[in-house]
Structure formats: C-alpha cells, structure tokens
Amino acid sequence: MNKALIFDLDGVLVHTDRYHFLAWKQIAGEIGAAFDEKVNDRLRGVSRRESLEIILEGCEEKTTEEQKERLLEKKNSIYRKLLEQLTPESVEVSVRETLERLRANRTRMAIGSSSKNTDYILQRTDLLKYFDAVVDGNNITKSKPDPEVFLKAAQFMGANPADCVVIEDAEAGIRAAKAAGMYAVGIGEAAGYSETDLGIKDMREIQHLVSFN
C-alpha cells in the first residue's frame, strides 16, 4: 500500500526556529529568566504553554496564571510579527520540489504540528495547497510527545497509522510518531535520535519511501 506522509512544520518544511528564539528571548528578558540556545533546544516540538513553563524554571519569582496568559499572548504577538518576513521563497527548493512531485503522484500528505500559527505560515509560504489535512495546536488537546496530533492526521487522511511516515526534526515529535505506531523519519538533529527509523539530510530522500504511479 502507498504510504501516507505526515510532516511537522517548524524546522522541517519552514525554518522558523530563529523567530521562536527571538520571541522567547525577549519574553525571558522581561521576566529575568535565563535563556540561551540550550534552553531553546528544550522548547522544540512542544506547545507554547509548555515552552513558557520551561522558561519559567529559570525565574525566581512565582508567576500567576493571569501573568502567564499575558506572556503567552505577548510571545505570540512578537512571533507573528516576525512571521511577516516569510514568503514562498522562504521554502527551500528541495522541499518544494519534493512536495510538487508527491502531490503529482497523489500521495496523501498532512501537516502534524503543535503550532497554533500553522495556517498562517502555510498561507504565507504558499504550502497549504499540497496537503490533504492540517492538524495543529488549535485542534489537539495534548502536544507531542503524545501521539494525538499524528493519529488525528492519519484519521483525517483516512490512513492506517501503520501506513504513515512522519517527518520530524524534534525528539518530542519522533517519540510521538513511534507512540502512534508510525515510521519515524528524522531530519537535522533528529536524524541521530535512537528512536528514529531513518535519518535524512535532504527532504528529497523521503521519495524512495513512496510508491510512484
């Protein structure tokens, strides 16, 4: 049976990691929390609220729920402003070429992301047209490494989880894929994770996992 593909968004199809870093760095600076690349690495693949909780570990003063909500809103506002820099040209050629070929082959494809800005990013980069389903932080209750996002993506595509391939760049995403009973492809740092089934350096490498008509 032909495989169905589920892509993470940030760091896989579009590189928005730097925007997240800059936004969280500003928030951390305002509350006096230590923040560097090491802390930022812990935020990859997890929800916005969980990311804030990690940052607050470095803050001596206690934060109320009301303050947390304000910080979350401010972080997203900063991040959304940075996302205005995205254009279709922000997508790597290898990514768009791969998606074009897979779409022409009628391969089922979905997005499985914890981000609540997924639709906005897909629209700005002209990537939405390639996907049969989009599951993101707006329609899940549990973030990665819980498998909910990937199981919903499979359901929306009408695909058996065992026939799905997940492409991820974060450890939480790889763990979620395996928990869903799916084949986990790691790109970037995730290529070397112990639970990764296949590590790749270039998006075009996933094409051999699909049967072409």
Q: What function would you assign to each model-found segment?
A:
Residues 1-3, 96, 100-103, 115-213:
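Asp-based, Mg2+/Mn2+-dependent phosphohydrolase catalytic module
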Residues 32-42, 60-71, 161:
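Short, surface-exposed acidic
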Residues 81-111:
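Short, acidic loop-to-helix structural element flanking the phosphoryl-transfer center
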Residues 21, 25, 48-53, 72, ...:
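An amphipathic alpha-helix signature
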Residues 1-41:
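Active-site neighborhood of HAD-like aspartate-dependent phosphohydrolases
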